[in-house]
Amino acid sequence: MKKLFLLTIFCGALAGCANMFGPPPAPGDSTAVVQSKLGRPTNVYPNGPDTLLEYAMGPLGQYTWMARMGPDGRLISYEQVLTDAKFGTIKIGRDNKDSVLRILGRPSRQVRYYSVDGDVWQYRYKQSDVWNSLMDVQFDRNGVVQALVNGPDEEREPRWLR
């Protein structure tokens, strides 16, 4: 009985992962087609006339995909946003929490540092598609970005490297 239960759990988990490895949605696909391929988005953000569908891979995940849907409900673009290039688009002193959500999606976690007079959002990512890294986006009390600081993601590195 225990083996049957474990087999059922394994098959369910495998079925849940099946969509992750299927073909990505294509530009022009409808919202219904995108959601049939990717499932329910983790968040939905209005962005002017467009809508952003966020597909975050969990708090320990290093990937978040954004599907940009046009006003006609058709896919304009689909991209992985936890990249060096996307972090580089954040404007210090200008971007705020709302704009960061639209650029990067939800953070892996939110922390507070005594040295930062505001919130810090942490994003796990593969820096240069190689290194396990953690990007801190630091906000002031008004929610405006004050700094971006990256370093190794110590939770993902082998203990002997620390």
Where are these regions (language model features)?
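Positively charged n-region of N-terminal signal peptides that target proteins for export
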Residues: 1-4
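Sec-dependent N-terminal signal peptides
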Residues: 6-9
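C-terminal motif of bacterial Sec signal peptides marking the signal peptidase cleavage site
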Residues: 13-16
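Residues within mature, well-folded domains
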Residues: 18-162
